[in-house]
Amino acid sequence: EEGWKTPEVAFCWLSLGSEGRKEQLLRTDQDNAVLYETPAPEQAKHTENYFLALGEKVTQTLIACGFKKCPADIMANNTKWCQPLSGWKEYFQHWILSPEPQALMHATILFDFRPVYGETRLADELKRFILEKVVAGRGFIQFLAKNALQNPPPLSFFRNFIVEHGGKHIGQAQNSHNFFLTGY
């Protein structure tokens, strides 16, 4: 709270991607977001600033604990990923109705959200909204399946992990780019 007037809206801290799926490995980066109730228009800017400051404080604390900053900046201290429920609904509706490559990339990270703190009812409401839109926009599942087939999990014929043979990730599997599960 540190000098901030606490907004009169509920919020929920979300873990995303491998964090959301509980598949986090020891050496991983952060993927997180903030979801908060849509405030009254006159409170919108203060509420946004409050939750961005909270996102900054938490992400910096996680960095101090050894969790690297997300290279794609998908973290709660980024305005794009610190949104009211109405903002998140707009994002997901756009991604579902316009499944272009960038939308599918966001889908593979953000559809695996898991509430880890706060009002989980907000995450439940968002999940219901997403499911309604996916059912109504039937073509999205086909695009998602095609994307999954183009980015298979890193498994060999014998079901062993395929690891990187060069670069800075030699001997490591890149699970955050090749796995996609749902639910929390």
PLM regions: where:
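A nucleotide- and high-energy phosphate-metabolite-utilizing enzyme signature
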Residues: E1-Y184
